[in-house]
């Protein structure tokens, strides 16, 4: 499942978005337990703001970009490749015993 770092936090003016991401986390865990006997794994990936055309439009001023970057301890915007690597890992044999997990790809945003 594709979720977001916002599935682990709250944020002003983003109540509905955060609520839907929290719901994905609950769905992921419930499905993981339900499908585990069939050896079907269910996980989610939770990226931070990712460098895409949509996000570039949202952070369209230096002030907005600076604010966003101040929230990411690693000091870099998430790349699509970062999200893809997390999904590939979770789908790989290396994650054979990983189910019900939420893999954060947030540069430390939620660690604060």
What are these regions (language model features)?
Residues 9, 88, 99-112:
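Short C-terminal tail/terminal secondary-structure segment
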Residues 20, 28:
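Active-site helix of classical SDR
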Residues 33-37, 96:
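Alpha-helical segment proximal to the catalytic Tyr-Lys
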